[in-house]
Swiss-Prot record:
Xref: InterPro entries: SecB, SecB-like_sf
GO BP terms: protein folding; protein tetramerization; protein transport
Subcellular location(s) of the protein: Cytoplasm
Source species of the chain: Shewanella loihica (strain ATCC BAA-1088 / PV-4)
Source domain of life: Bacteria
Gene from which the chain derives: secB
Name of the featured protein: Protein-export protein SecB
UniProt family annotation: Belongs to the SecB family.
Database matches in PANTHER family: PROTEIN-EXPORT PROTEIN SECB (PTHR36918:SF1), PTHR36918
HAMAP family reported for this sequence: SecB
CC per GO annotation: cytoplasm
Coiled coil (UniProt feature): none
SUPFAM superfamilies attached to this UniProt entry: SecB-like
Keyword field contains Cytoplasm: yes
Lineage: Bacteria, Pseudomonadati, Pseudomonadota, Gammaproteobacteria, Alteromonadales
Length: 162
């Protein structure tokens, strides 16, 4: 019986220790002139994730969102949010850990970042902005494929030079 309890404790563990805003910025470089024009924006979303090991089985993951809205040729607003979290993760293979840090944790952080962006845009008196959900699993799979292709290309180049 005690052996079964130990096996359960040794299984995969995932705990959110903290979710917080690491950095936030909102700029309206062409105000107040931007408010005098018809509103027909082109909105661009750039996102990035990074992770760092803080201690054994404890990681910080930072999701960075940059939203740029242009109205014609002028930038209406630029919103930058770094939403971070501290996660305790153990009992995973290296591949599972990489997926957790690169896809699952950003999925946890994205709703907080999306809310922060929406709030900043509203405080700037711009029309409501609702960011569409992001498929971090697909983005992570694409990243893994790119890394594999780069590794294969590097291996082929090394063989050609040998």
């Amino acid at each position: 019986m005690a052996e079964a309890v130990n096996n359960e404790q040794q299984g995969p563990q995932f705990n959110i220790q903290r979710v917080y805003t690491k950095d936030i910025s909102f700029e309206t470089p062409n105000s107040p002139a931007v408010f005098q024009k018809e509103w027909n924006p082109e909105v661009k979303l750039d996102l990035d994730t990074r992770s760092a090991k803080l201690a054994d089985d404890v990681y910080e993951v930072v999701l960075s969102l940059t939203v740029t809205a242009k109205n014609g040729e002028e930038t209406a607003f630029l919103c930058e949010v770094q939403q971070a979290g501290i996660f305790a993760i153990s009992g995973l293979t290296d591949q599972q850990l990489a997926h957790s840090l690169g896809a699952y944790c950003p999925n946890v952080l994205f709703p907080y970042a999306r809310e922060a962006v929406g709030s900043l845009v509203a405080r700037g008196t711009f029309p409501q902005l609702n960011l569409a959900p992001v498929n971090f699993d697909a983005l992570f799979a694409q990243y893994v494929q790119q890394r594999q292709a780069q590794a294969e290309a590097a291996g082929e180049a090394a063989e050609a030079n040998a």
